[in-house]
């Protein structure tokens, strides 16, 4: 009788293994929390290994289970859904997906306000300063901007930093994120306003040989500064909004078509120029096609601006594919938006995307020392 029971159990185990390629979950111990103020150095040490070990997610998180199952399938050569490492492309939005989004508004806007209104080293034209002042007052009062302001803001921001080298601009952004506090949340600078659970997700995918790109409306060089040292993502894996670059002595009339008419002087610096193109909504698809040459198999975003990326990931993809949508439903530990979260969840249900609840699935967002104020 014991022999029969053993055989039945063994057959059941074999059958279970043939159905699912998922490995056993690895459940970590007490989450690591720093003493005192959170630093970027601490964030850089948040890592998840190949087999899991997530600290900052609740272990019964439905989204985490979906993620682990998907990764287990596409990385197992014995599974039908196996994907070669070079094709395990994953794309992540930044604002609201990796970085605090509306505190009180998008990072690009807050950097723009700082440059035009609160930076004594820069004097913008008066009409531009007035526009920035009016926009700041509106944004601070409403946590949103007029839908027609986006292009103008990008153009003015590019002008505000025009002529800077990459070293100068990176230093400026680094100084901003390391010294400017997030509005509405205590004990939090912009440089540490990164979601701990999402740092884990990115590191988990990298450990499993995914090729990770950030796909965002944030300025490409800003994105590089924010990501540096936190995520194991190369600087050339940023699909983002762009400015033109010019040589320091290059006349304004020399553009791409006539660039052969300009003779480069060795040692000339490459400088930031005027605004070129946003990388939001459908432009994410266009830029992914141009820069990746293939579809991602995993995408992660948080709003309707990421829906084109989700559709691009999931329609006519030759490989297994999945998209996650982060819901801004935490009203206690984050500056959430319940209406937006509900709408996004409904859209997930309609389209087969995976909703991720900050409130219900994350043990922490920025660490327990950060509170709404």
Where are the predicted features?
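C-terminal cap/substrate-recognition subdomain and adjoining C-terminal extension
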Residues: 36-53, 171-373
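Positively charged n-region of N-terminal signal peptides that target proteins for export
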Residues: 1-4
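Bacterial N-terminal signal peptides
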Residues: 8-16
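Alpha-helical substrate-recognition element adjacent to the catalytic core
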Residues: 33-254
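Acidic side chains
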Residues: 24, 93-95, 306
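Bacterial Sec-dependent N-terminal signal peptides
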Residues: 17-37
């Amino acid at each position: 009788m014991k022999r029969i029971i053993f055989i039945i159990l063994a057959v059941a185990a074999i059958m279970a293994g043939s159905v699912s390629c998922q490995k056993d979950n690895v459940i970590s111990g007490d989450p690591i929390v720093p003493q005192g103020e959170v630093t970027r150095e601490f964030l850089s040490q948040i890592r998840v290994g190949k087999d899991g070990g997530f600290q900052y997610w609740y272990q019964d998180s439905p989204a985490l289970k979906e993620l682990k199952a998907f990764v287990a399938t596409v990385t197992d050569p014995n599974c039908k859904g196996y994907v070669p490492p070079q094709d395990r492309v994953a794309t992540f939005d930044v604002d609201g997906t990796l970085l605090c989004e509306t505190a009180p508004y998008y990072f690009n806007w807050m950097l723009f306000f700082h440059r035009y209104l609160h930076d004594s080293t820069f004097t913008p034209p008066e009409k531009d300063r007035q526009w920035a002042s009016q926009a700041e007052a509106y944004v601070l009062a409403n946590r949103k901007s007029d839908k027609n302001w986006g292009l103008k803001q990008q153009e003015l921001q590019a002008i505000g930093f025009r002529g800077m080298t990459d070293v100068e601009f990176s230093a400026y952004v680094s100084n901003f994120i390391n010294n400017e506090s997030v509005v509405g949340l205590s004990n939090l600078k912009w440089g540490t306003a990164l979601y701990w659970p999402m740092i884990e997700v990115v590191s988990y995918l990298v450990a499993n040989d995914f090729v990770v790109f950030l796909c965002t409306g944030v300025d490409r060089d800003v994105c590089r500064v924010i990501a540096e040292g936190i995520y194991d993502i190369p600087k050339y894996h940023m699909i983002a909004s762009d400015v033109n670059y010019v040589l320091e002595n290059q006349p304004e009339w020399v553009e791409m078509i006539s660039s052969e008419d300009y003779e480069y002087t060795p040692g000339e610096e490459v400088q930031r120029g005027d605004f070129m193109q946003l990388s939001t909504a459908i432009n994410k698809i266009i830029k992914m096609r141009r820069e990746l040459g293939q579809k991602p198999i995993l995408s992660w975003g948080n709003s309707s601006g990421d829906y084109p990326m989700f559709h691009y990931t999931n329609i006519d993809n030759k490989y297994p594919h999945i998209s996650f949508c982060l819901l801004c439903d935490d009203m206690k530990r984050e500056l959430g938006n319940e209406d937006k979260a509900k709408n996004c969840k409904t859209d997930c249900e309609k389209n087969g995307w995976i909703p991720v609840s900050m409130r219900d699935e994350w043990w922490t967002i920025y660490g327990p020392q950060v509170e709404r104020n």
